[in-house]
Amino acid sequence: MYYNEDDRYAKHKNLKRFLVLLVLGFIFYAGFQLFKGWPKPQLELSLKDQQIPGSFNISWPTDIRYGVIGTLQSGIISKTPNQGQWPLASVAKIMTAYIILKDHPLSIGQDGPTLTVTQKEVNEYEAFKKDGQSVVKVALGEKLTERQLLEGLMIPSANNFAYILARWDAGSVKAFVDKMNKTAQSLGLKDTRYEDPSGASAGTVSTPPDQFKLTQLAMQIPTFRHIVAMPQVNLPIAGIQYNVNYDLGKDNIVGVKTGSSLPAGANFVFDSKQGNIDILGVIFGASGKSPLITALKDAITLVDMTKTQLSTKKLISKNQQIGFIKVPWMKKEIPILASQDFSTVVYPGMKITYSLYPVKDIKFPIKPNEVIGTLVINYGDSTYSMPIIASQEIEAPSFLDRLRRVF
């Protein structure tokens, strides 16, 4: 076949263009591969979910309306078959004290600010007393510290002290009740509604699970825990006032609050300190000839049934390998470690599950002990999170690593 010079030149030119484009394409591809981001490192969990052998057994008393039992450390273990809203009566004062101590913290031994009793508060005392409410005597001009007001609120259960504290904290009782409801909402107490700071209103209602959760938080405040464990208090005008919680000291009960009214019957939130375990329970609507005595006796029964089934177990040890990290440019898997110990109260049948989440943006190089993720432990009714750390240095990809990626 005959080709003229123009044909040969055109073919040579086209080949040259093709080769140039091929080289440019390769350079572009290589550059892209060298500098594009790497796939995200993968964290993998090696911990296995577990369940404590056996089953938790409890017989709920038949003379209460609603109840829950559990521990301060690991949450609710058992509930009565039915649950619902119920008038709180003086159990409402747990929230009142909780808010006061959050807004005006007191260390154990501190008295806090001093308040002066007004004529309005004397009149309020007289009106509440006439109405048959639980009150503590006050006098015009009497000086009461924040601590004394909290002691009068939680020990002899003074409704009038709840109103004094409410006005001091929020400016008015209405504003304080609004704060109670907002606090309940922020804590996830979905079935709780407050109409007053003392619980005298039948419209102040909650459920045992909600009050269990609130008391878990309140009992972590040292001053709250100290006050509810006191058998009596000596106040300036009223003198010695005794705790309405007659279970104090029995079966190591260290608090927390009783509540009685015609609509409520008797309610009792209690904490029994068994070694390093706090058994926490809530009883609503105890009945019988003496409902409060029923509630107090049932609490002891529940503690006795519960305490033999509890133990403390270490679930995680500091520096324990809980999984590994896979890095695309490294062939080996790098162990990842727990940053702390974690122990909790366990019971028969308790389920324990683990989940692992990486930090949002892992940046290299990673130093030894650098936080690269979060381990979430779900145990019974509770959740705990801890940082997860790298066991060794993990270098950023080198130029050679990137170059290998091209080929």
Region locations from a protein language model:
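Active-site-adjacent loops and short helices of periplasmic peptidoglycan-processing enzymes
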Residues: 2, 6-12, 36-209, 216-222
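Low-complexity, intrinsically disordered regions enriched in charged/polar residues
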Residues: 9, 25-28, 46, 316-319, ...
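Functionally constrained cores in energy, signaling, and assembly domains
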Residues: 16-17, 61, 70, 86, ...
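Hydrophobic membrane-insertion alpha-helices, especially the h-region
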Residues: 16-33
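Short acidic/polar alpha-helix capping motifs at helix-coil junctions
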Residues: 17, 126-129, 146, 232, ...
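Intrinsically disordered, low-complexity regions
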Residues: 31, 49, 61, 186, ...
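Domain-terminus/edge residues, biased toward the C-terminal soluble/receptor-binding domains
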Residues: 189, 202-204, 210, 215-407
